């Protein structure tokens, strides 16, 4: 090999290689492959620089014949091949005159045209693996990397190859020739196998033994060991690589990766149309409770008994009448349904023993409200095979709705504190192991912050209603059962309270599949006058049913009491998830925990106590048109909980789609904020995917509006 090197390379290059090996204490008689590699690398560096000049106008030109009259400056400063002291002197001088950032490792060249240092690599392995080892070693955005291989492949930072095609072809041809010459002498295999990876000086967390073997076994194809894969991942430069791969896949695919800049994203377009309406399964901020404190009546805990007891606390009932009709419904039927509930409750009270459940008489108004006999007749598919024009019935496209202010008000209310405690300390699961002392502490702090939150009331209300409805749907399939909407809580003083929000009457419920629908009519008490925001109550018929005396600063005032009535429906799978709404507590607790973990890892100690007890510190809660909203840690807990609860209450395909698609845009924006220079292709397609989810759902529209606020402030 030594003889081949002396024959094959220019004597000046051989001499420089000898000096370099001597400087590093290596014997070229033994390390002959290393000797050949150094010579090859030097030659590539010189060829890279050859014939490239900068003229008087500062333009880069190629001059192959020496013209003594031309006032030309070499485009590249060659650093490789100088002894270390001299090389660093050159680097320092370049940094001082050009303002370039000083590299940690000695680079090979400096490009006066592009004003950057260049690291040249020549590899006998795959270019991308070697590229990534180089990138991982030098860890500098400023140094440009250009790798050549003996097979004619190359790879460069951001697919920017610096030189023209012809100059690079000269280098590739020379490398190919060296390879053939070596092969003809039987030297190539030994040379190819002798290449070691770039040695970095930093310490690495070593994996040994079984874990190491498992790691090596589970690598993607084409990676021989974990180190190669690590290097590949650490320095992967995706943009040019993805473009190349896509164009190989198909001629039709043309993914031009565009840089994503602060000016690139536009706001998400929200739909126009009438304002969106309330679509939750039960009233939220508008609900009114009839309550009993310290219940101790006979049959306490039996829903029907509790409901009757709560109804007796109110004395302001009056002859009901419709104050806001439902545009598409038969409003007298809603009125008759409420009157029937009152009458049948009265009947129960007149009985000697109150029954545990109450099935309503199947009157015409309830049959209409519950859609009895309205479903089209089901026909077996086999009986229809011969019908030539069999088709699914046409359904209308949903009408586009615009964002309305009521949904933001609902969310704000859900974050507020009530005057009752809705969960006990042990509501969020028990400790499983002694290690969880910190977990217990976090859970207790978190519970204290959210136990009085209105979102927590919604959880308990949702769990109760869904459990009761699913039980009744299975136990009384054919009956129109009356189900009280009840919740339980404690006052701040610790007294127990039972609350009645209204009633549900369920329809026939032969639920075979998870998605089979059970219809129900909900009747809920409220003090909200529906005429203030009629668009919110589009799906409701609202009755005035009584007058309530309320204590106020000026004494007692009488307010009309309303009943919000609507037909609704749900399914087994929706009720199953509704019963598990307590998961929202866990989800938001985990989000808070990750904030504490981040803080703890910075301070290198557990910060749970400080996190919850330092009342003066504020944390980011969310975006609004005013900017980033901040609040106490308790407010953060309650806001995260409210978001999780609303995701459950307003769950829909629109929300699923919006969350998945907008997340992609969010990640790109965050990458831009972190100065990672993200690139995108088909950004228009992503916007389309996001915007096709914005139809009429109030919670999705609100999230889209928040996202726009985030975009505005994130890209300032």
From Swiss-Prot:
Residues annotated for Mn(2+) 2 binding in this entry: 80, 108
Q: Where is this motif: Nuclear localization signal 2 (NLS2)?
A: 184-247
Listed EC numbers:
3.1.-.-
Mention any one GO cellular component term assigned to this protein in its UniProt record.
host cell nucleus
Q: According to its UniProt record, which cofactors does this protein need?
A: Mn(2+)
Motif range (Nuclear localization signal 1 (NLS1)): 124-139
Q: Which family does it belong to?
A: Belongs to the influenza viruses PA family.
Localization (cell): Host cytoplasm; Host nucleus
Q: What is its main location?
A: host cell
| Positions of Mn(2+) 1 binding | 41, 108, 119-120
What is the species listed in this Swiss-Prot or TrEMBL entry? Influenza A virus (strain A/Leningrad/134/1957 H2N2)
- Look up the record and give one Gene Ontology term from the biological process aspect: symbiont-mediated suppression of host mRNA transcription via inhibition of RNA polymerase II activity
Question: Which InterPro entries does the record associate with it?
Answer: INFV_PA, PA/PA-X, PA/PA-X_sf
Can the keyword Hydrolase be found in this entry's annotation?
A: yes
Q: What does this protein do?
A: Plays an essential role in viral RNA transcription and replication by forming the heterotrimeric polymerase complex together with PB1 and PB2 subunits. The complex transcribes viral mRNAs by using a unique mechanism called cap-snatching. It consists in the hijacking and cleavage of host capped pre-mRNAs. These short capped RNAs are then used as primers for viral mRNAs. The PB2 subunit is responsible for the binding of the 5' cap of cellular pre-mRNAs which are subsequently cleaved after 10-13 nucleotides by the PA subunit that carries the endonuclease activity.
GO terms of molecular function: endonuclease activity; metal ion binding; RNA binding
The subunit structure is: Influenza RNA polymerase is composed of three subunits: PB1, PB2 and PA. Interacts (via C-terminus) with PB1 (via N-terminus).
What binding details are noted for the cofactor?
A: Binds 2 manganese ions per subunit.
The answer to keyword Phosphoprotein applying to this record is yes
After translation, the protein is modified as follows: Phosphorylated on serines and threonines by host kinases, including human casein kinase II.
Please give the name of this protein: Polymerase acidic protein
